[in-house]
Amino acid sequence: MPNLVLVVNVTVNPKHTEALKPAMLENAANSVKEDGCLQFDVIQSQDDENTLLFYEVYTDADALASHRETPHFLKYWNMMQELGDGVKRTAQLHDLIS
């Protein structure tokens, strides 16, 4: 079974970007310590500093589900929820084939 890739595109209201970035980076740093998380990158657009991308690689769907229950993810997720319309998020799941 191929590894699971989650690509998340986040567009943040400019007034929230600097406040949200530390939570994103903390989530990423702690996520790669999880057994089933192989990679977690936070990428910022060169064209728009308020557009960020998460590139996450997990061993399988169970590892992703476990990730979503961790304290660091929940801290990030709750912050995103509090911002409401100040954050737009889309996510896509992929199979890693290379």
Locations of the language-model features?
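N-terminal first-folded block
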Residues: 4-33
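Short flexible/disordered coil segments
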Residues: 8-9, 70-74, 96-98
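An amphipathic, aromatic/His-enriched active-site/gating alpha helix that lines ligand/cofactor pockets
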Residues: 30-38, 57-91
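Short, well-ordered beta-strand segments in beta-rich or mixed alpha/beta enzyme
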Residues: 4-11, 41-68
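Short phosphate-engaging motifs
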Residues: 16, 50, 72
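Glycine-rich beta-strand-turn "strand-cap" elements at beta-sheet edges
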Residues: 2-5, 42-48, 78-98
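Short, glycine- and small/hydrophobic-rich beta-strand elements in well-ordered beta-sheets
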Residues: 29-52, 94
